[in-house]
Each structure stands twice: as structure tokens, then as C-alpha cells.
Amino acid sequence: MLNGFIFKEFAILQDRCAMKVGTDGVLLGAWARGGKRILDIGSGTGLIAMMMAQRFRDAIVEGVEIDADAVGQSRENAGRSPFADRLRFHHAPLQAWEPEAPFDAMVTNPPFFLNSLQAPDKARARARNAEFLPFANIFSFARRWLAETGHLSAVVPAEAYEAFATEAFLQGFFLERLYHVRSTSRKPVRRCLVSFARLRPEMYEEKTVELMAPDGGRSAWYDALTEDFYVK
């Protein structure tokens, strides 16, 4: 598919989006906790929102995104999917957006450049630069709009994890799941899947997982996680 990806139940076009479909988004969409009302913060192409809509068949899934082109394309992607009646995308900065009601779950693949260095592609730089969506703003929004029993799940680069988790703790959230993700057992951890709760969790889960098997294919863990999405 030119300028896009075909998954088992939907397709993603991305020619007007600064941030393209990647492993991070697929991981989060397949791993995150859900609920009846789900919000994707920085929804981009709509990939994660659509994965959540596929996994949680009764959920209303909304996305909020600052880039107008991405919002337009995510709406078109959603409109071609089987979940069109349960997906809504809003064009607004998170800091200024007021949803209609609280959410049971939030997901985010947040900007991760922690300095002001801008890439040549301004749209891509904005999508990836934490100056445009500081971690503090994500958690202050979640304090207002995440249900008391809700969960906030994210995927962040390993080097950004401490800053992200520190902000969560400062704003009263509890870490309930942490997966250290590496490509193979011989490679360093490159990204972290994290889940925070408003209430202190009864159990805490932490593990290290690999994306690739020794033969170069998907690992058993990654294959099981994404089997409902990737076309074989």
C-alpha cells in the first residue's frame, strides 16, 4: 500500500502525517489497558486509536492532535474502518482542549526530544519535540480527565523514561506496569512500555522483552501481542 500500511481489520494512510506508522505505536496499541472511553493523546495517523477500537469493541475512542493535516488524515482513515462510528478525532492542543466527559483509559506516544533542537522538517520536529507537549501537561490533563480507576499507558524511549516517570510520580500517579523493550537479547533496551494508575495498584509487573527471535523473525512475545493486527 503506497504511503500506508494494511492491517487485518483496517488500513492507515500517512502521506499527510509528520509522524509515520512505526513499531512504537503498534506496541502501545496492542499492549495498553482500555475501557469504555479511551483517549489517544497526540493521535497522529489514528493508528493507536484504531487499534484500541479493534481491541475494545464497545469503547468510544477519541484522539486529540495539534496538527491539522494529521487530524484530517486520521478522520479519513477512521472513516474507512469498521470502527468509524466509535472513533472521534479533535484538532486542538491538549492544554486547551476540554472533553465532554472523563476517560477510563488514556494512551500516548509522546514527543520525546527533550531539548529545543529542531529537525529540518518542522512538522516532524514539532510532532517529536517535547516542548510542544511537555510531559507535565500530559499528567496534569490526566489528573483532571482520567477516571479515578483509570490507567494511562505510554511508550517512551529508554532515555526519556526517568523524566516521564518522575513527572507521573510528582503528580500523584502510581506505576503499575513497566516493560523494557529491546530488539534482541544482545541489544540494549531502546524503549519502555509503561502504565500508570490513579490508585495504588495491588500488583506491579516489570519485565524485559525482545521483539526479534534468534532466527530474525518476530519473537514469540511480539508475535502473540500483535497477531490480531499484522497481516501474515
Predicted features and spans:
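Residue-level signal for inorganic ion chemistry
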Residues: 28, 109, 138, 196
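Conserved SAM/SAH cofactor-binding pocket of Class I
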Residues: 27-101, 105-108, 114-120
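General small-molecule cofactor/ligand-binding pocket signal
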Residues: 13, 88-90, 176-179
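SAM-dependent Rossmann-like transferase core, predominantly class I methyltransferases
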Residues: 2-37, 43-50, 54-55, 192, ...
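A generic structural signal for alpha->beta connector loops
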Residues: 9, 58-60, 84-86, 149, ...
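SAM/dcSAM-binding transferase cores
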Residues: 186-232
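Mobile active-site "lid"/loop adjacent to the S-adenosyl-L-methionine
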Residues: 110-137
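Conserved Class I SAM-dependent methyltransferase catalytic core
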Residues: 17, 132-189
